[in-house]
């Protein structure tokens, strides 16, 4: 048994904040109430005074690198990193080696996760065989085996007819298509956002329309096919406008952006910081503001981390040779609190919706809720704690965080999943 004392419970934007104790028995919340009787001999007692308790988080877009790239990350190390950041459900992308493009590979990911992961790992299947953009993968069989979405993330499905067929199949199998929107005819060879910083650094730029033209295409295809299109890692103001327009049309489109896109700009790459090389690239302050407004209005539905671990040897090279991507599990909540709550006046309940209710709804799961009889999936957060992101404190096998050296506010101190304590008082136990 676990007893959390003096909890300030935040379930969502619309629920009132409740101050109470939480009693956890086995994997469920047994009781929520005032002054629950303590029994130190039979229960673990956690004092949450001055902290908030909220449902644990879900990430619908991450990379665990297994199989094939275990030197960067694997299912066990990635899951531990996710747990450290408060995530107890994560959806891993199929760009592994071999790719997750068939029933057997989906089964493998699920088997490995059951074997080594302390949290829930859900596989995303590929749209096309081998992620080659030439032939549709086994969408129906992968859905049967447990894939929760399909995506060729890391690559764009450039063939519009193939993408249309993928959307048609996804509709028939009731599975969302997660679209990586990048016109490679426009972005090929690009390193950073096309603009002021690309000009002064001499690095080849990626025009913003490389993202928005594919978003426009996919919205029209989703409208025609009446399919669920999910647009991932949105980075430009034009993209936000297009998604807003699509929702006004009644298109079944959802979208996410990432912590680094709502907090940082292209100026992070001044000095050729390869940890700031991500795809899509960091954009301008105008884009940051448009993304924040999109989150506020509900145009962008949720936050994903796009946790993309890379070995130090793939980052400690010339900028144009460096791999694209940043890790994100362990900093996600703190970045959102620092840049959305502290700096832009978001309600903390809105962050719960962006990290729990909305991503789970997109992939067809009910939200984690702190109510009697529900599964005990929760985090305890110190909203006042300030901490610096340091390489030596990162749990992930790779350390390529764009937030290294930055000071963030709020810290996920304790994580409980299905009644098991994965992290307590900042110490990971899984």
Curated annotation (Swiss-Prot):
Binding-site residues for Zn(2+) 1, renumbered to this chain: 61, 63, 153, 306
Entry's Gene Ontology molecular function annotations: allantoinase activity; dihydroorotase activity; zinc ion binding
Listed pathway(s): Pyrimidine metabolism; UMP biosynthesis via de novo pathway; (S)-dihydroorotate from bicarbonate: step 3/3
One GO process term, biological-process aspect: purine nucleobase catabolic process
Enzyme Commission numbers on file: 3.5.2.3
The UniProt record lists the keyword Calcium: no
Binding-site residues for Zn(2+) 2, renumbered to this chain: 153, 180, 233
Cofactor(s) annotated in UniProt: Zn(2+)
Disulfide bond sites: none
UniProt remark on cofactor binding: Binds 2 Zn(2+) ions per subunit.
Entries under PROSITE patterns matching the protein: DIHYDROOROTASE_2
InterPro entries assigned: Amidohydro-rel, DHOase, DHOase/Allantoinase_Hydrolase, Dihydroorotase_CS, Metal-dep_hydrolase_composite, Metal_Hydrolase
Family matches, as PANTHER family: ALLANTOINASE
Homology family: Belongs to the metallo-dependent hydrolases superfamily. DHOase family. Class I DHOase subfamily.
Task performed by this protein: Catalyzes the reversible cyclization of carbamoyl aspartate to dihydroorotate.
Listed name of the protein: Dihydroorotase
Species for this entry: Caldicellulosiruptor saccharolyticus (strain ATCC 43494 / DSM 8903 / Tp8T 6331)
The organism's taxonomic lineage, starting at the top: Bacteria, Bacillati, Bacillota, Bacillota incertae sedis, Caldicellulosiruptorales
Encoding gene per record: pyrC
